[in-house]
UniProtKB/Swiss-Prot annotation:
Keywords: 4Fe-4S, Electron transport, FAD, Flavoprotein, Iron, Iron-sulfur, Metal-binding, Oxidoreductase, Repeat, Transport, Zinc. [4Fe-4S] cluster 2 binds at residues 305, 346, 349, 352. [4Fe-4S] cluster 1 binds at residues 295, 298, 301, 356. This is F420-dependent formate dehydrogenase subunit beta. InterPro entries: 4Fe4S_Fe-S-bd, 4Fe4S_Fe_S_CS, Co_F420_Hydgase/DH_bsu_N, FRHB/FDHB/HCAR-like, FrhB_FdhB_C, Helical_ferredxn. Pfam families: Fer4_8 (PF13183), FrhB_FdhB_C (PF04432), FrhB_FdhB_N (PF04422).
Length: 394
């Protein structure tokens, strides 16, 4: 019997999926099984668009099409939670399975706390994430640093501390630290992220810790909820996937990799954040005013933020008029208002910074303040569905 906190090596019994899906195709097989058994109405996943650097969210209702979403897209920088709230009515009238990076899963949990997603209708199949790559800069990096043609790349991955780029006839790996010191590599928000294994999802899957005969042929699965346990047990009973107990050394290696990534994140936090550990929250906002004064009030940050969902935004209300119309840069109240609305639930997904045309380091600002909020209130963003965000009123 599969139970919460169990760990396994898992691989698909379907040869086509095992070959096309990564590390034995367990993720793809689980998603296909959910649709075939009618446990969900649709699967929300990401598939390759025009090329490797273009990740497109897709809603799949036909089991045979799930395989189109197989494989990783490290240049897929979207936050899938926004799709659920904006286009699927928060899964309030549809049952879905969704593949989630840790920041996706954390955001889904935070938005659910605010009553905008029905978690009873969502199964989160979480995948490990050591960071995503900005598409445009990654193409430039591949050409300038790796001396490869970006259009010839068939795969990219982070393994053993290296960013590895593969074409059909060549492979080259360079230290993650080295490429990031050059200004390339992972997105800046990903560098600071300590959440690599999505234990806030229903299942946490990845290749870390798979050693021995199944190395490269199976996925490491950690069961993180009752829903996840039920799904895995049914899939195994149906003969869709096969599971084996993990090699103890593999469990140890997985934890070491995770801890190494956490240590690297803390190094980047120290590099990016205010060194005054006891600094007041608002002091952090004040010291970024020069950056915030670049704002052209385009509202891209609000539109991109998966935590922003108000039907009537207080930044645009006429009565009272909190923000003076036509003034650029806007009053500091513009950013203070946004901060009060979302910063306690900020998951450092980086959407705001990625879309800002003024190149304001918004993700860094909100992430730093969110860390202060967590320290001050003892809050753990993205976990514990019963714990309300400290700055949010029901």
């Amino acid at each position: 019997m599969v139970e919460v906190n169990d760990m396994y090596y898992a691989f698909s019994k379907n040869e086509e999926i095992a070959e096309k899906g990564e590390y034995g195709g367990a993720v793809t097989s689980l998603l296909k099984f959910l649709l075939e058994e009618g446990m969900v109405d649709a699967v929300l996943a990401v598939k390759k668009g025009s090329d490797l650097y273009d990740a497109v969210p897709t809603l799949i209702t036909e089991p045979e099409k799930v395989i189109e979403s197989a494989g990783s897209l490290h240049c897929g920088t979207l936050n899938i939670a926004k799709v659920i709230t904006r286009y699927l009515n928060g899964a309030k009238d549809i049952k879905i399975a969704v593949t989630t990076k840790p920041c996706d899963a954390m955001t889904i949990v935070e938005v659910a706390k605010r009553g905008k997603i029905d978690l009873d209708n969502v199964i989160m199949v979480g995948v490990n994430c050591g960071g995503t790559l900005p598409p445009v800069k990654t193409r430039a990096m591949i050409e300038e640093v790796y001396e490869m043609d970006p259009d010839d790349v068939v795969k990219e991955e982070i393994a053993k501390g290296k960013l590895i780029i593969e074409t059909s006839d060549a492979e080259k790996g360079i230290s993650v630290d080295e490429v990031e010191e050059m200004g390339y590599g992972r997105r800046t928000n990903c560098r600071r992220c300590e959440k690599n294994i999505p234990r806030m999802a229903d299942l946490a899957l990845g290749n870390w810790g798979v050693i021995g005969p199944l190395a490269g042929k199976a996925t490491f699965v950690e069961v993180t909820s009752e829903k996840g346990a039920d799904l895995l047990e049914k899939a195994v009973s149906a003969g869709v996937i096969e599971i084996e107990d993990p090699i103890p050394k593999g469990i140890e290696i997985r934890e070491k990799i995770d801890q190494a990534m956490v240590n690297l994140a803390k190094k980047w936090q120290k590099n990016d954040f205010n060194e005054e550990t006891g600094a007041e929250i608002l002091m952090n906002l004040d010291r970024y005013m020069d950056e915030l004064n670049k704002c052209i009030k385009c509202y891209s940050c609000r539109e991109a933020c998966p935590i922003c969902y108000c039907e009537e935004c207080s930044l645009e209300t006429k009565t009272p008029e909190w923000i003076e119309k036509g003034k650029i840069p806007p009053s500091p109240l513009f950013h203070l208002e946004r901060m009060l609305h979302m910063v306690d639930s900020c998951t450092n997904c980086g959407q705001c910074e990625e879309l800002c045309p003024a190149e304001i380091p918004l993700a860094k600002i909100w992430h730093e303040i969110n860390c202060r909020v967590q320290e001050t209130f003892g809050y753990k963003t993205g976990f514990e569905t019963g714990q309300e965000p400290p700055l949010t009123h029901p």
